[in-house]
Amino acid sequence: MNPKALFQEALELGTPKPTPASLWGGGAWAFALAGASYRELVASPDLVAQAITSANEKVGSAVVFVGSGFTNFPMAALGASLEFKEKGAPALVGQAVADLAQVDRLDLDRLDADQALQTLQKAAALVKEAIGATAYVTSISWAPFTFAGRLYGMDRLMTALVDDPKGVEALLERATEAVFRYHLPYLEAGSVDGVAMADPMASGDVISRRHFQQFAQPYLAKVTQRFAERGYPVLLHICGRTDDRLDLIADAGVKGFFLDHRVDLAKALEVVRGRMCIGGNVDPVNVLARGTVDDVVQAARACLETAGDGGGYVLTPGCDIPPDVPLANVQALIRTAMGA
């Protein structure tokens, strides 16, 4: 029962037995488990890799996400600032793009020269060497729409969708190239099996289906195709409601979509089963963080029962998990799938 092999079968829309189970993200949780601060991690590939591998040796997630917890660091490499805190991931301060008319001035070569990003690249190679036989290793970043919002500021981007759509499109083109450039060193090194992206600002809680179709999906599709041409599948998570855009996500070429816990799993499977693998969707806060082991087992079993035997399904939390989720609860999530 190799978790990686089970996941790969599900990703190809097969029906592995047992059902694979995975976290989404999990970086901040793994680092908290290791007692490591981001100031320490950012300068030490060994420490990053050790935290990720040690956590996964305890829980057996089918997928690991190198760079989870660091998704704002590319913005810092491109000119924004980060505010380090005692606990949790650093907060993004300011924007790398002050004016949409100056998007072309964004120097993407800074992604290649950034020490923190190099730390993650080296860590991925160490993780792949240590657990790559049993865990599907990915690099992770924001997807183009959210990446653009982090570069320019989400409130300003929302206004510009109406006031300056051409300027937004120019920003999105640049953000799409930045996302590709961010992941490229991992692909060239062969240190990952796939690419993961998160796109919280493309949620139905933030933008309409029409705006998603106009501003988010085309750039998601473009970068997904570039990764696919190199043989790397894309895994995606969007926070919140995505019921009205699941078909568009599948149309973008996404191989595996990890649902938020607020999305109806049964309805999602009705829409896209057979088109892309679905992960979902145990509540990460009310069940995994605040619930008991029994609560986790019951919620996991409910998801497994809903998914049934139709294939292309992975048991996952409905988002990244908080740093304070008890280890026993994560173990219960994975164990319930692997023992089912």
PLM feature spans:
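Active-site loop segments of alpha/beta catalytic cores
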Residues: 1-30, 36-38, 51, 62-66, ...
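Short, structured active-site "lid" loops
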Residues: 40-50, 57-59
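Glycine-rich, N-terminal phosphate-binding loop and its surrounding beta-alpha-beta segment
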Residues: 52-82
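Short, basic/glycine-rich phosphate-binding loops at helix/coil junctions
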Residues: 96-106, 197-198
